[in-house]
Amino acid sequence: MAKPKFIALALVALSFLSIAQSIPFTEKDLASEDSLWNLYEKWRTHHTVARDLDEKNRRFNVFKENVKFIHEFNQKKDAPYKLALNKFGDMTNQEFRSKYAGSKIQHHRSQRGIQKNTGSFMYENVGSLPAASIDWRAKGAVTGVKDQGQCGSCWAFSTIASVEGINQIKTGELVSLSEQELVDCDTSYNEGCNGGLMDYAFEFIQKNGITTEDSYPYAEQDGTCASNLLNSPVVSIDGHQDVPANNENALMQAVANQPISVSIEASGYGFQFYSEGVFTGRCGTELDHGVAIVGYGATRDGTKYWIVKNSWGEEWGESGYIRMQRGISDKRGKCGIAMEASYPIKTSANPKNSSTRDEL
């Protein structure tokens, strides 16, 4: 039977950087077909996008609609977040959904009859209240933003971000680990570029360990498992747990202790072109994308947010991150962020022969 397809100051600086990496435009650029065409050519040059003439004409029509949407949204004076003309500029939302947010995590979990949150939650009885804010980037537990490309491997990037985090917290060493090993080798239930689940990936790493990004670099496609590297793990974990579902307080308690893997619905226009600010936009709970929460905080006006590390490259969002509204009335959280959270457990030392001195 075929397996189912799953699937502070620093922030200010990140905001400016995200703007610099997108293509700015003004009313003048929207004034005519010629000016819009010139903007499209500028966008294509910036992103080195090659198109034949027929495809270019078709994509130009998509581009115009996207520019109009971004412009009209950014005219809203009270919007707490902004959109930008990023690398998805001539892609329809349907194409974006299928290529970057196509892992129906919740649907495929239910297909397999998997029940969440049947085990314990190690942070449930932590005595002290979590800090008002935390940023694991500032604590040195987060590697640079990576890019999954047009491969549905978000589940691998989410998993690796959490494992990189707990490894740094426990060992003091930040090591960039291999998503490609999961894509190629974790194939019992996960399906590489066709999607997967973070819990399965945690189980794989618990059994096999994981090697470094440098040793097993990302290829943006499914490949044959490199068994020699599979047998030479650098980092290990001892298990994983799920955060109690639909409970942002429990999620906050977990994030206060380590980066956490979560699933969200990320397929809307607001996500496609998100640039900066706290995302409060429209989204549902059809979980289709795996990411990692690496902190939380609040703006000066009191808007609470999660700091979320994405895997769409540094140009998207706040240099690859998005701040998502926290503490909303829906217990499932913004875009379902509190529905499917999990994290690795590490109590043992890494394999003795491993060398965790890796480039970042």
UniProtKB/Swiss-Prot annotation:
Note the pro-peptide positions: 21-133
Task: Supply the InterPro entries for this chain.
Answer: Papain-like_cys_pep_sf, Pept_asp_AS, Pept_cys_AS, Pept_his_AS, Peptidase_C1A, Peptidase_C1A_C, Peptidase_C1A_papain-like, Prot_inhib_I29
What EC identifiers does the entry list? 3.4.22.-
Q: Where is this motif: Prevents secretion from ER?
A: 357-360
Q: Which residues are glycosylated?
A: 353
The protein's matches in Pfam families, at most eight in alphabetical order, are given as:
Inhibitor_I29 (PF08246), Peptidase_C1 (PF00112)
Class in the EC hierarchy, top level? hydrolase
Which keywords does UniProt give here? Disulfide bond, Endoplasmic reticulum, Glycoprotein, Hydrolase, Protease, Signal, Thiol protease, Zymogen
Keyword Transport listed: no
Looking up CDD domains in the UniProt record yields: Peptidase_C1A
Chief location: endoplasmic reticulum
Which cell locations does it reside in?
A: Endoplasmic reticulum lumen
Which terms in the GO cellular component ontology are assigned?
A: endoplasmic reticulum lumen
Q: Which GO terms describe its biological process?
A: proteolysis
Residues annotated as catalytic: 154, 289, 310
Disulfide bond positions = 151-193, 185-225, 283-335
Q: Does the keyword Glycoprotein apply?
A: yes
Range of residues in the leader sequence: 1-20
As one GO molecular function, the record gives: cysteine-type peptidase activity
Give the family, as the similarity comment puts it. Answer: Belongs to the peptidase C1 family.
UniProt protein name: Thiol protease SEN102
Organism for this UniProt entry: Hemerocallis sp.
- What lineage does UniProt assign to this protein's organism? Eukaryota, Viridiplantae, Streptophyta, Embryophyta, Tracheophyta
What gene name does this entry carry?
Answer: SEN102
